[in-house]
């Protein structure tokens, strides 16, 4: 989308992308390298739709998605839009074929330019009221004793969407600019790892 808008001279400084906070940071890298504003929002297409609504008439939305592989390519439908996404991927596949490439080739090209990404989800199930209490305690424990290292990589940034704070390893603290609080914790490591925890 961005590449073709650039080639056609249609990429504007007012264009923006949206991703949810738990979505791959490859999107952030794409936005950064192409000087496109990126907005992070909470999970759910209502939050992506909110970003479109607050920018209506001022900025142009050019795409957004979340980790569940949902994508919203246009601003007309304000929810996960599979039919439009299918049309868009068909258009991209046709363009790739004209270039003698496949969708897989394009994906590898994106990874080579912006960085590889691997995502996975771990579900911890604790049934009943006792389970709900255990999960609540897990979140409290993570807040009280945040990890300093994950998988052998040092944690350099910690985001708490309940207190709306970003803490850095150097001790500095910034406010998170979000429209509401959410019970989500994130850690960012030196090797590029991002871990998100939410009940």
Spell out what each predicted region is.
Residues 1-3, 16:
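Hydrophobic, small-residue-rich alpha-helical packing segments that form membrane-like cores
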Residues 8-197:
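Phosphate-binding and adjacent anionic-ligand microenvironments
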